[in-house]
């Protein structure tokens, strides 16, 4: 069902490569425990949600010049949300920070097997050199207070911090003093409450 929904919503994507990516996750999950998603749920909460929410986040960026966007995905694990988005938008400049070595190895494998070009940093985001990213994002990595701390040294003015969250985001905002995140609900077709906590660094 959700595999077909992905095809219907994103007809111009490289569906063959997306299927290969899903198959690699299913195969590698047996040994590496990459994600709890499998089967139709993998297509729903892994693939569709990633592409849909990343499209939404990119829409929050003021990109009148239509420049190549530089995106950092923190703790992508098996590649969510950035890899499905990269497959559908190969023109972006993607960097992934992933500290778990087995997941890093998986990301290296998919880069080679799917011929995907992205920068992979196999260490915690706190240890990477500051770079000018247009967007810094993460999904299911940490609460807003922690995300605020670990990204503090690596963002620049005008960087968009945009984190994919569930309904608990409202409690996280209350606990993150002086963080000043805005919350927006992402209307979607998978009957799931998805929110984006975002702000532009001043």
Curated annotation (Swiss-Prot):
Record keywords, A-Z: Cytoplasm, Methyltransferase, rRNA processing, S-adenosyl-L-methionine, Transferase
Gene3D superfamilies assigned: Vaccinia Virus protein VP39 (3.40.50.150)
Subcellular location as annotated: Cytoplasm
GO molecular function, one term: rRNA (guanine-N7-)-methyltransferase activity
Enzyme class at the top of the EC tree: transferase
Main location: cytoplasm
Residues that, per the record, bind S-adenosyl-L-methionine: 75, 80, 125-126, 139
Pfam families according to UniProt: GidB
UniProt-listed Enzyme Commission number(s): 2.1.1.-
Family of this protein: Belongs to the methyltransferase superfamily. RNA methyltransferase RsmG family.
HAMAP family linked to this entry: 16SrRNA_methyltr_G
Name of protein: Ribosomal RNA small subunit methyltransferase G
Originating organism: Mesomycoplasma hyopneumoniae (strain 7448) (Mycoplasma hyopneumoniae)
């Amino acid at each position: 069902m959700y595999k077909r929904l992905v095809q219907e919503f994103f007809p111009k994507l490289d569906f063959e490569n997306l299927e290969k990516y899903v198959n690699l996750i299913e195969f590698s999950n047996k040994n590496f425990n990459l994600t709890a998603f499998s089967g139709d749920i993998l297509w729903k909460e892994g693939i569709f949600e990633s592409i849909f929410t990343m499209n939404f986040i990119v829409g929050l960026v003021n990109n009148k010049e239509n420049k190549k966007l530089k995106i950092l995905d923190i703790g992508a694990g098996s590649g969510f949300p950035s890899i499905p988005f990269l497959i559908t938008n190969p023109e972006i400049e993607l960097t992934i920070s992933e500290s778990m070595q087995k997941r890093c190895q998986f990301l290296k494998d998919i880069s080679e097997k799917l011929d995907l070009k992205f920068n992979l940093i196999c260490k915690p985001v706190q240890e990477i050199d500051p770079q000018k990213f247009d967007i810094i994002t993460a999904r299911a990595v940490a609460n807003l207070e922690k995300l605020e701390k670990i990204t503090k040294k690596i963002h620049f003015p005008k960087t968009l911090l945009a984190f994919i969250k569930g309904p608990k985001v409202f409690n996280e905002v209350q606990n993150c003093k002086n963080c000043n995140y805005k919350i927006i609900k992402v209307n979607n077709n998978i009957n799931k409450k998805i929110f984006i906590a975002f702000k532009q660094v001043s």
